[in-house]
């Protein structure tokens, strides 16, 4: 599919996707863990450590892919992505304010746990054929949740369908949210 060219820098699709996932997780972490409130898109950049963190993520070698400066120029890739990050965290904060959450990104423990389980139990190796989520937000204790999922998957008869059902129930009860990082429209 060729390399996406972003702000005149060539970068592989996979590398860019990984950056987006880390950036989303980072913004969510600032919002959830560090209690940063972003009332509008610009606030993400006004918060120095969020801005610095995002710029560190969107860097390939010595190439700075995104620079986040104010005012945000509309219709630029930066504008599109900041808006996406903003809308995601806004929607989630609305649903989950005042709770105790842990945010896991693609490099995090829960992702490894669930991918490992699916691989071991159902012989599905690639994360994307069974597409869970790019980021998980877990309410309460991650280890208790993992234990619960693990014990419900013990025994022989379980199918991936049952795991999905369980994850869906957890989602309905707002104990676990999986976020997929497709761009969120304005």
Feature map (PLM): residue ranges:
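Short, positively charged
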Residues: 2-186
């Amino acid at each position: 599919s060729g390399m996406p060219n972003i702000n005149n820098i060539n970068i592989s699709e996979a590398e860019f996707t990984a950056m987006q996932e880390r950036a989303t997780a980072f913004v969510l972490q600032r919002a959830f863990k560090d209690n940063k409130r972003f009332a509008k898109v610009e606030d993400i950049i006004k918060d120095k450590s969020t801005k610095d963190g995002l710029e560190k993520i969107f860097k390939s070698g010595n190439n700075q892919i995104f620079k986040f400066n104010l005012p945000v120029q509309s219709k630029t890739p930066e504008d599109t992505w900041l808006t996406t990050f903003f809308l995601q965290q806004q929607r989630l904060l609305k649903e989950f304010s005042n709770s105790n959450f842990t945010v896991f990104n693609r490099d995090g423990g829960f992702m490894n746990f669930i991918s490992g389980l699916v691989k071991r139990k159902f012989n599905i190796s690639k994360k994307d054929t069974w597409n869970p989520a790019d980021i998980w937000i877990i309410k309460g204790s991650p280890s208790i949740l993992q234990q619960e999922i693990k014990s419900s998957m013990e025994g022989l008869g379980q199918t991936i369908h049952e795991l999905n059902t369980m994850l869906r129930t957890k989602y309905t009860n707002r104990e676990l949210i999986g976020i997929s990082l497709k761009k969120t429209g304005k």
